[in-house]
Amino acid sequence: MFIGYRCSRNRSCLDATAVITSICRYALPPRFGKHVVLSFPRRVIASGGGNDIAARFVAQRLTEAFGQSAVVDNRAGAGSTIGTDIVAHSAPDGYTLLVVHNAIAINQTLYAKLPYDTVRDFAQVALIGATTNTLVVNPAVPARSVKEFIALAKARPGALNYASTGAGGTAHLATEYFRLETGVNLAHIPYKGTAPGLTDVVAGQVQVMISALPGTMPFINSKRVVALATTGAKRSAFLPDVPTLAEAGVPGYEFDTWYGLHSPLPRRGCRRRCS
């Protein structure tokens, strides 16, 4: 589902090795005075959804590489700012890492004031990978293609609701992009994460959601939702029979979700002491 997973098993191993190598170079702390801090990454903070899956991928590799158990700590909410703030104010000792996605860049333009500085408070450790998103609907929605869904939405303007992971989040922006390109009128219902949004799609409280593939696949496989399209430049190997939105009648549409790894940077005073 991530970049490495779309390739062979050997390529996945290479990608995992690259991530661990980057962690060793950038996440592990420098010499503090006359002492070297030997704290290996053992806490990976995520914000749920696809971030949780990416974090578990990283935690498993960390455990294998360092022989010490690494745990995933999910801190969802407020457009990923809760977990991000925790890491920003964590000790820069190599113990804590943060899985980020598109929201780390989006939030700078969304919030007037953040409790952290996206540029100054973090070291960019590694790119974990990227994944496509999926446009899914409740099975009761009378549409089994994107064209049928667009026709239904235009026939019932404002009557269909879509879920997102919060205002300004990737699911929100991806769906607004879809609305802009197709001219449909959908009502926005923001949720506090992927799972609550998809749960209400299943329950029929909302009819549609565009969400990252890793978090959506269990719902698709269990037939609790119907996948109409993916948002990448090409079809997903995990859903080879599902067309891209560009193929399905929305030319030029492409919207991927990427995942990266950050670590906290020392505050200015600490950086001076470490130099």
Predicted feature residues:
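Residues marking helix boundaries in flexible regions
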Residues: 4, 21-24, 151
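Short, compositionally biased segments
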Residues: 6, 30-46, 263-275
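N-terminal (or domain-start) structured segment
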Residues: 14-120, 159-161, 182-210, 219
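Hinge/capping helix and adjacent helix->loop/strand transition within the periplasmic-binding protein
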Residues: 62, 89-94, 109-196, 245-247, ...
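A ligand-binding cleft/hinge motif common to bilobed small-molecule-binding domains
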Residues: 104-113, 172, 177-181, 208-242
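C-terminal lobe and pocket-closing loops
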Residues: 130, 216-274
